[in-house]
């Protein structure tokens, strides 16, 4: 359930002042006047020629590219920036580029000033996406949130519900969805070029740079003066600071902070599959993977999903298989009309249809086979659109997003169900999407939602 008032959004963390709480409640009350409006109506509150004011939570890494990407739109103003790291790779660089923006270390204090801006960019590590984004939507803010949408399946469902309840404009940061390559592949499927799709194989075969399949480091290191380590940990279990293992990038290898290789790349590579076939939620899945270390993600896995059939698939169900490991690719005999001399991309998807197969490389032009039936120079090509401008213009009532949370939520739920399956290899998990329940495996069900750190438990979890 989402909270009836903003009190439940405030982590019970010491140091959050009484005045700050009053400001938050006042802001929430003001935001409540717009909650019943749809996105286009809400944008008109600002006026026909209004500008979009944005705040960014997370300004390093993808936060930097998201912030500069959105701010490149001529009708966007950067009002506030927030990061737990004040170095020039994070808040310092953003402050230098946007000197008029208010600066924060604590996202909760930024939201105290919610009356100053209309939209929030969320580019924290995975485990903080939902706490920040849900609080922002509750205050009436549009949200652009990096992928994967959330850290748990339950959070992904709450994000969908909140976006619908509050009528916010939302977009997940799977930017490649807007690239010509992915849009073209989706168009080919929708045009019936290869007929009904019988099966799908998706894979990620490159080596990540973060730690995998290893024990958590022991001991602790001095916390740098420019890093607010407790704020970085947020809702995650409290851990000692270790140089080079968590912040700023290697958090991606640890279960408490990330969603592993499947969560990180699945929202990109499976995206054109979902979009082309109009998939929703799987009904069952089985994973193959080595036993996990207690804290880190595996270095290889295969997940077999089964989805209900759609208008673009053959039969009552459609199998989709995910593979990740260095150098991995799907079995050639399963890929239909693709000739043996064709070198599969390092990462991507193959959709096997009645009349041919489509290869969708990760960020490269798709190919259709057999090539004699699909001459490349005669195939339609869709243009690239700007994923960031699309969201900004949708907030102003001038466009619609293509990766709103009503779409990104089920996609994220799917990849996160796969990460649960990886915990229980060779065991089929049966999924009831409506009930948000793994019906045949009580231990696996416990991972659908995870507890928050003591003192950081919002009521909607």
Protein language model regions, located:
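Glycine-enriched catalytic-core subsegment of oxygenase/oxidase enzymes
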Residues: 69, 77-82, 86-97, 265, ...
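Beta-strand-loop-alpha-helix segment that lines the small-molecule cofactor/substrate pocket
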Residues: 130-178, 192, 426
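N-terminal secretory signal peptides and thylakoid transit peptides that target proteins
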Residues: 10-32
């Amino acid at each position: 359930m989402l909270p009836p008032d903003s009190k439940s959004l405030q982590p019970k963390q010491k140091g959050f002042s009484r005045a700050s709480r009053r400001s938050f409640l006042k802001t929430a009350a003001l935001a409540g006047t717009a909650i019943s409006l749809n996105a286009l109506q809400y944008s008109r509150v600002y006026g026909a020629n209004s500008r979009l004011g944005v705040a960014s939570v997370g300004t390093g890494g993808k936060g930097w590219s998201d912030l500069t990407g959105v701010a490149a739109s001529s009708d966007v103003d950067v009002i506030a920036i927030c990061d737990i790291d004040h170095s020039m790779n994070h808040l310092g660089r953003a402050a230098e580029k946007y000197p008029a923006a208010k600066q924060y270390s604590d996202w909760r204090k930024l939201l105290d000033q919610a009356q100053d801006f209309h939209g929030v960019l969320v580019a924290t590590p995975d485990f903080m996406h939902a706490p920040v984004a849900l609080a922002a939507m509750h205050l009436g803010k549009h949200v652009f949130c990096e992928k994967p949408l959330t850290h748990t399946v339950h959070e992904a469902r709450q994000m969908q519900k909140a976006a619908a309840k509050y009528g916010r404009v939302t977009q997940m940061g799977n930017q490649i969805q807007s690239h010509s390559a992915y849009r073209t592949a989706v168009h080919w499927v929708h045009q019936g070029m290869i007929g009904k799709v019988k099966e799908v194989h998706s894979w990620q075969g490159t080596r990540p740079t973060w730690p995998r399949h290893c024990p958590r480091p022991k001991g602790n290191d001095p916390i740098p003066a420019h890093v607010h380590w407790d704020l970085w940990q947020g809702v995650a279990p409290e851990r000692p600071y270790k140089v080079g293992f968590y912040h700023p990038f290697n958090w991606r290898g640890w279960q408490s902070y990330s969603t592993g290789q499947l969560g990180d790349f699945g929202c990109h590579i499976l995206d054109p599959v979902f979009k082309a076939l109009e998939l929703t939620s799987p009904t069952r899945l089985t994973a193959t993977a080595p036993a996990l270390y207690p804290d880190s993600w595996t270095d290889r896995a295969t997940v077999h999903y089964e989805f209900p059939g759609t208008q673009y698939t053959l039969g009552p169900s459609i199998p989709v298989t995910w593979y990740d490991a260095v150098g991995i690719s799907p079995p050639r005999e399963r890929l239909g009309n693709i000739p043996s001399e064709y070198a599969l991309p390092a990462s991507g998807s193959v959709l096997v249809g009645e009349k041919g197969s489509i290869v969708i490389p990760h960020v490269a032009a798709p190919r259709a086979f057999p090539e004699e039936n699909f001459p490349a120079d005669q195939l339609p090509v869709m243009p690239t659109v700007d994923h960031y401008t699309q969201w900004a213009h949708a907030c102003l009532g001038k466009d619609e997003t293509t990766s709103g949370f009503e779409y990104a939520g089920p996609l994220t739920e799917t990849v996160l169900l796969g990460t649960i399956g990886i915990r229980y290899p060779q065991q089929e998990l049966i999924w009831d999407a409506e009930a948000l329940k793994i019906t045949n495996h009580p231990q696996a069900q416990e991972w659908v939602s995870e507890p928050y750190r003591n003192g950081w438990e919002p009521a909607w979890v």
